[in-house]
Amino acid sequence: KNGKCVFDDVVNELAPKFEEADGLVVASPVYYASANATLIAVLDRLFYSTHFDKTMKVGASVTCARRGGCSATFDELNKYFTISNMPVAPSQYWNSIHGREKGEAVWDEEGKQTLRVLAGNMSFLMKSIALGREQFGLPEKEERVFTHFIR
């Protein structure tokens, strides 16, 4: 109710930083085709407890795995952005990098390139939105309509 999580921990430390930021990058290793459970708990609490407008803050997610599960985890993380009116920064491939042991991801040339392109695109998108906000303002928000499927 007050824009803070009832559990007074790192989530309440992140919230004011997120409010001031133009974008948010979230990264996770892949466990059973899913993001790290602690990260998901933080994101659930952060996005649920904060009441500031997240519209047009740019989101980006990055995953790291030995082999599979990256695209499912990528989708899981991006859902926080898309339900919050946040555009998602693109790259030339899904934002993942591969490695099994510590330090191995440095050998994933395609993954590193994908993340470099992501960084450039995210920077460009945040700058473009800032210029658009100055010149045109943000899109007009509609009053939320909620549909209940059980009547």
Q: Model-derived features: where do they sit?
A:
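Short, hinge-like loop/turn segments at secondary-structure boundaries
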Residues: 1, 78, 107-109
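Helix-loop-strand module that forms the ligand-binding subsite of alpha/beta enzymes
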Residues: 3-93
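Glycine-rich phosphate/pyrophosphate-binding loop and the adjoining helix
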Residues: 87-151
